[in-house]
Every structure is written in C-alpha cells, then in structure tokens.
C-alpha cells in the first residue's frame, strides 16, 4: 500500500573514487516518518498520561470508608457538682460507615471500565495521527512529481525555442513565433520554481509532526502513481466490525453498565455505626456505648440517576447503528474514489501518455521540416503536460482514498513493485 512504500534502491555500479568523494544520500521513508511521529507526537503520549490519572482514581475508588476515632468529655468546669472533674464523663468512640448495595464493587467496576476505554481511544488516535503522516508524506511526493513534470515541460519548451530560433534564422518563421515560445518557456520556468517551493513547504509540514523545523534527509522515497490492488468492497466492509470506532462503543457499553450498577447501589442506604467506651468519674464506673443510623428514602432519591443511566445505556444501540452506517458510507465513498482513480491512472499510463509522446515526437519532426505550424506543436505539448498533471491528480485522489480505507480498516495494502511512467 501507499502507506508502506519501499525505500529507493542505491546504485550498485559506482566508481570507487566517486564513492569516496560523494557522501551517500540519506532517504526518508514513510516508515521512518511514522516511527518518528509515533515516538514524539503529543496526541499519542496523551493516552499514557490519562491512564496514570485513571489508575490513581481507581485506587481512590477502591478504598473503603475510613475509620473515625473520637473523644467526648462532659460535665466538667461547670457549676455545683460539675465544677471540677469529679462528675466528668469521658467517651472514646470508633465509628465508620458500612456500605450496602455493592457500592465498593460498583466503584471498582466503573474505574476499571474507564481504564479499559483508553485502549480503543489510543488506537483511534494512533490511526488518525498515522493517517495525517501519510497525507503529509503524500503531499511531498505529489509536489516532487509535479516538479518533475514541470522540468519535463520546461525541456519541451526549450526544444521549441531552439526550433523556432532555427526557423527564424532560416527565414521560415516570423519573430512572433520565437517570442511566443520564449514566453511559454518563462511560464514553464515559473511552474518549475513554484513546484520546488511546494516541495520545501511540504517537507517542513511533515517535520512539524515530530517537532522538527525541517527534514534532514536528502531524498523522500515513494511514488504517488503506485496504486496497489485492494479487496472488493464487500470484503473491506467485513473488516469494519473490528475497527477501533466500534470497539470504543463496546467499551462504552461496559462503562455505562458500570454506571447503572453504581446508580442502583445508591438505592441501598449506608449504615453509620459507632461504638465506644464511656468513663463515669462520679460513679467510678465504665460503660459501653454505641449507635447506628440509617438514611430514609434512599431508594426514591436513587431513581432519577437509575433512569438516566438506563436511558444512556439504551441509546448505545442507536449510536452503534449510526456509527456503523457512517463508517460504511465513508468506506463506500473511499473505495469508489480509489477504483476511479486507479482506472484513470492505468488508462493514462497505458494509452493516453504513450500516444501523446509519439505525437509530440512526430510534431517536432514535422515542425522542424516545415510541415506543421508552431501552434499545432505547442498545443500538443500543452496536452501532454496536462495529461501528466491529470494522471498525477487522479493518483493523489486515489492515494488519499487509500489512506482513508486503511484508517477505517487498519489493514495495510502493500505495493509490490514500483512503476513510475
């Protein structure tokens, strides 16, 4: 697949002296770019920080209610018999809350569901970031190939200027033809310079993804005209069942189940208890004390939260159906755009461009021999340049669709051979 383009092969036959004088050029592949972004992009590191937060919250939610120690003294520093400490009553207590209804287990389940929900979120973020890397890498490759087309067009215009000058010197053509050819050559030079600037801008945009100002590599591997074979739409549609977007909804169901369980546990009131020892100084005696309390109406107060949790859970099926339809429609659109671009690129490579190349050669011979006009040759050159631009545009559209297909399915489609017409 486009996302897995192989690196450019090094030249095998090079004189030894030249190999010593010229340092080898470094090549940045798409896999290299992905590795750099995966190690440094903040969106991918964000999930690790979120997991640390949720783990700490899970440890907090797993704690039982604390024990409370208290002391109370009565009948001291008053008047009459309580003027001193003779009638003092000192009570030391130990108190806590007995949770009922499975609140502790419900909190633990909810905390774990939140942690588990990070996995599909991390997978979605990774696919989104890698798709962004692939798109920016594709932008570089497309700009580089537009620069190549501009160089070829410029070479054509230079040949035209040379031929027009020869015919002018021979008195077989007016000066206006030469001036027109020179103007078209200047426009071709402008297209070349603009394409070169686009390459530099695209390289900087890619480097920003891993926090760099520019790409140190000399070359960027890959060919936008490489379009691999992909399965039929029905086969790709089956892969959507395991996509991270739907996996996220499965984890969301467990999360909402846990919220419902926690809401139901609130219907059982907690039992507040307290036990202690009381010292009766006036009677020189000791006694045990204790009390329990239970909140009333907990079941009624818990009903709104229970109904809200049930409503959220029932909405999940609708959300899953909506998400599946959206993924299905996006995949269908991307698959159709890829097939159309693949067909156009192949037809241009096999039929249109070879025919225009032969026609260009024949028109050049005819013009130099005086058998055709400059206008016919110039129009043919423009058609050939436009055809190459059209082929590249179709290839870029197909590659963009292919990146979207991989983002949806998470499956690579590898190009087995490079074919650059």
List each language-model region with its residue ranges:
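Bacterial N-terminal signal peptides that target proteins for export
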Residues: 1-7
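Short, solvent-exposed, mixed-charge loop/turn linkers that connect secondary-structure elements
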Residues: 21-24, 28, 193-237, 270-272, ...
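N-terminal signal peptide c-region/cleavage motif recognized by signal peptidases
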Residues: 14-16
